[in-house]
Curated annotation (Swiss-Prot):
This is Protein kinase C theta type. It catalyses: L-seryl-[protein] + ATP = O-phospho-L-seryl-[protein] + ADP + H(+); L-threonyl-[protein] + ATP = O-phospho-L-threonyl-[protein] + ADP + H(+). ATP binds at L386, G387, K388, G389, S390, F391, G392, K393, V394, K409. Its EC number is 2.7.11.13.
Length: 706
């Protein structure tokens, strides 16, 4: 292993150097790399390689050895020496390592002046050299776990674009004019007009958004029959006591002329909010919405009575054959689309649904005693905490009845609700219930809930994840990386065949079982119903793995999974990320514009596969166009045997027992395994019907319990 720095010099500023005054100097730089040696005369630096003269804004490479320094001399056309400085390469590499492999600094020159230097850290391996001290000192980009991000869910109501928002100051709802309580994301705020509301008041909004272009066009053409247009008569007002804006909900600041007051209805608003206020002068949105809801429910009841009357009297205008007329028509049929794809869905007392339309099915329900089974967290012993985040915690748990070990993911309902992730949680449950059909997806046994938490009971994979293993060996050899890549391909293609885009493929989400086979985990970012030409445009994923089409705001499909697969394969083979940046802005620019660095020692087939996966035109990317299984890197793979797990993995994790936790990060294992406390006020005010269809039981768990 021979690490090196790729260095660029630019923006030389001579300052007030006397040598530069008068005529144009046209400075250029000379770079001398010197080695530290011991001699008879003591310690000294000797130049062994020729002097380099890199042009401004170009790059050159310098290998890193302890004691090696780089002397930079700035010269001029008519001046022998303007300025100089000396940089220790080892210290520069350490600085790069702390900044995700890249740094940018201003070098102060002597006697005067400065220049901008960019440096990027790389690894270079030859087949004959062993890994040296730089591995043990951590010169790798993959030194920490990276969390996923997701664009806030947008609720489109009357052209408003409401997103869950944290209000840092006291805020009042613009619909009911009551205080918005809470500690996290207390309510919704429109991204267009800044209107603030309670989450519970989102169905009571009757005014169309004033900041939406769609609204202005619809208003122009009078497309909606129901329309209210009562303009306010605002005038500047001096408030003598603290007053809140009735549009954005925040305080009116200032000592005088703090805001505007409507002469007719007394509404108070900021100056900046005046143009965003809807024309609802004198109208109570809450009462109006309740009246409209009552009218709608009355109309629905009338339609239902009319429908029942038609069923009782029979069809009048259409003649039907006697055989059809005489058939008994049930008053209500179960909806096939709401049945679980497999297993048995059972409902806890919190989930009980309206049974007014229940039709008994004796033939189907004859032998289904498991419907009465209700699991609870007290049926398990929590031994260790395997991980945690803002969402909740993951525990190693033992089922008391059978002494079998499971991984239980516990989500906090208040956090799920505050982050607007109810639908994501339901998607994760549906994908996990489907995962039993494939060997390389994490299998779920059941889900259940309490008033405060949601629980996923999944198989315990004690081999750890790929991020844990790559931190100890820094990179995988070609055969091991190829094996993992092939199994991941099978898992991804199964998800895609079911219309599911995964969107969060990374080392952290690839687990190993006790035999060394991979399992794809964590389906919270998945997007369903993506068959055919269907596309979506949600901004989500882990920053290092996000595809360029997501960053550009384009609509996308499963092509983004193949880009993420390329990043993951690059990290497995090379041991660092293909794209770098000191912050997300630089990283995203690198993903959109930069070409990854491929070391000389990388196998030709591996490089070819990576190049085809990093194509920025989604429709031309391998996996979207062409069969990725036919790539030369996988020519030794028998795909049928691989899917049947008949090929032995090249690496088998060290597992001492079914409950062994040695392959997980130690930072969590020492913590006491207990559930987090929830926001009681929020839990008590929460509509539990949002989680009504969460509970599920797989036939595998059914057999264990019975």
């Amino acid at each position: 292993m021979s690490p090196f720095l790729r260095i660029g010099l630019s923006n030389f500023d001579c300052g007030s150097c006397q040598s530069c005054q008068g005529e144009a100097v046209n400075p250029y730089c000379a770079v001398l790399v010197k080695e530290y040696v011991e001699s008879e005369n003591g310690q000294m630096y000797i130049q062994k390689k020729p002097t380099m003269y890199p042009p401004w804004d170009s790059t050159f490479d310098a290998h890193i050895n302890k004691g090696r320094v780089m002397q930079i001399i700035v010269k001029g056309k008519n001046v022998d020496l303007i300025s100089e400085t000396t940089v220790e390469l080892y210290s520069l590499a350490e600085r790069c390592r702390k900044n995700n492999g890249k740094t940018e600094i201003w070098l102060e020159l002597k006697p005067q002046g400065r220049m901008l230097m960019n440096a990027r850290y790389f690894l270079e391996m030859s087949d004959t050299k062993d890994m040296n001290e730089f591995e043990t000192e951590g010169f790798f980009a993959l030194h920490q776990r990276r969390g996923a991000i997701k664009q806030a869910k947008v609720h489109h109501v009357k052209c408003h674009e409401f997103t869950a928002t944290f209000f840092p100051q006291p805020t009042f709802c613009s619909v009911c004019h009551e205080f918005v309580w809470g500690l996290n994301k207390q309510g919704y705020q429109c991204r267009q007009c800044n209107a603030a509301i309670h989450k519970k008041c989102i169905d009571k909004v009757i005014a169309k958004c004033t900041g939406s272009a769609i609204n202005s066009r619809e208003t122009m053409f009078h497309k909606e029959r129901f329309k209210i247009d009562m303009p306010h008569r605002f005038k500047v007002y001096n408030y003598k006591s603290p007053t809140f804006c009735e549009h954005c909900g925040t305080l009116l600041w200032g000592l005088a002329r703090q805001g505007l007051k409507c002469d007719a209805c007394g509404m108070n608003v900021h100056h900046r909010c005046q143009t965003k206020v809807a024309n609802l002068c004198g109208i109570n949105q809450k009462l109006m919405a309740e009246a409209l809801a009552m009218i709608e429910s009355t109309q629905q009841a009338r339609c239902l009575r009319d429908t029942e009357q038609i069923f009782r009297e029979g069809p009048v205008e259409i003649g039907l054959p006697c055989s059809i007329k005489n058939e008994a028509r049930p008053p209500c049929l179960p909806t096939p689309g709401k049945r679980e794809p497999q297993g048995i869905s059972w409902e806890s007392p919190l989930d009980e649904v309206d049974k007014m339309c229940h039709l008994p099915e004796p033939e189907l329900n004859k032998e289904r005693p498991s419907l009465q089974i209700k699991l609870k967290i007290e049926d398990f012993i929590l031994h260790k905490m395997l991980g945690k985040g803002s969402f909740g915690k993951v525990f190693l748990a033992e089922f008391k009845k059978t002494n079998q070990f499971f991984a239980i993911k516990a989500l906090k309902k208040d956090v799920v609700l505050m982050d607007d992730d109810v639908e994501c949680t339901m998607v994760e449950k549906r994908v996990l219930s489907l995962a039993w059909e494939h060997p390389f997806l994490t299998h779920m046994f059941c889900t259940f809930q309490t008033k405060e938490n949601l629980f996923f009971v999944m198989e315990y994979l004690n081999g750890g994840d790929l991020m844990y293993h790559i931190q100890s060996c820094h990179k995988f050899d070609l055969s091991r990386a190829t094996f993992y890549a092939a199994e991941i391909i099978l898992g991804l293609q199964f998800l895609h065949s079911k219309g599911i885009v995964y969107r969060d493929l990374k080392l952290d989400n690839i687990l190993l079982d006790k035999d060394g086979h991979i399992k794809i985990a964590d389906f919270g970012m998945c997007k369903e119903n993506m068959l055919g030409d269907a596309k979506t445009n949600t901004f989500c994923g882990t920053p290092d793995y996000i595809a360029p089409e997501i960053l550009l705001g384009q609509k996308y499909n499963h092509s983004v999974d193949w880009w993420s697969f390329g990043v993951l394969l690059y990290e497995m083979l090379i041991g660092q990320s293909p794209f770098h940046g000191q912050d997300e802005e630089e990283l995203f620019h690198s993903i959109r514009m930069d070409n990854p660095f491929y070391p000389r020692w990388l196998e030709k087939e591996a490089k070819d596969l990576l190049v085809k996966l990093f194509v920025r035109e989604p429709e031309k990317r391998l996996g979207v166009r062409g069969d990725i299984r036919q790539h030369p890197l996988f020519r030794e793979i028998n795909w049928e045997e691989l899917e049947r797990k008949e090929i032995d993995p090249p690496f088998r994790p060290k597992v001492k027992s079914p409950f062994d936790c040695s392959n997980f990060d130690k930072e969590f294992l020492n913590e006491k395994p207990r559930l987090s406390f929830a926001d009681r006020a929020l839990i008590n005010s929460m509509d539990q019907n949002m989680f009504r269809n969460f509970s599920f039981m797989n036939p595998g768990m059914e057999r264990l319990i019975s």
